[in-house]
Amino acid sequence: MDQDVAEEILNKEYEVVYEGKRFLLKPAKAWVLQPPGKPGVIVALFKLPNGKTVRKVIARLPP
């Protein structure tokens, strides 16, 4: 990931739905997951107010 793109992803708030509740959170960590021969996705870790950590796909990369 380009440095500017990575910084933009980490500073943006995303809507995370967990157990029927919606949260607007900034990711704690994000990375690209791209299996060979398939389009990739950007996965992020979010820390919920109750202390749990959840993963969510926040973007899809072009093939």
UniProtKB/Swiss-Prot annotation:
Family to which the UniProt record says this protein belongs: Belongs to the Cren7 family.
Subunit description: Monomer.
Function: A chromatin protein, binds double-stranded DNA without sequence specificity. Constrains negative DNA supercoils.
InterPro entries per the UniProt record, alphabetical: Cren7_sf, dsDNA-bd_Cren7
Organism in which the protein naturally occurs: Pyrobaculum calidifontis (strain DSM 21063 / JCM 11548 / VA1)
Keywords: Chromosome, Cytoplasm, DNA-binding, Methylation
Subcellular location, principal: cytoplasm
Entry GO MF terms: double-stranded DNA binding
Pfam entry (one): Cren7
HAMAP family xrefs: Chromatin_Cren7
Protein name in UniProt: Chromatin protein Cren7
Gene3D superfamilies: Chromatin protein Cren7
GO cellular component terms listed in the entry, alphabetical order: chromosome; cytoplasm
Keyword DNA-binding: yes
Compartment(s) where it occurs, according to its Swiss-Prot or TrEMBL record: Chromosome; Cytoplasm
Gene: creN7
Record PTM text: Methylated at multiple sites, to varying extents.
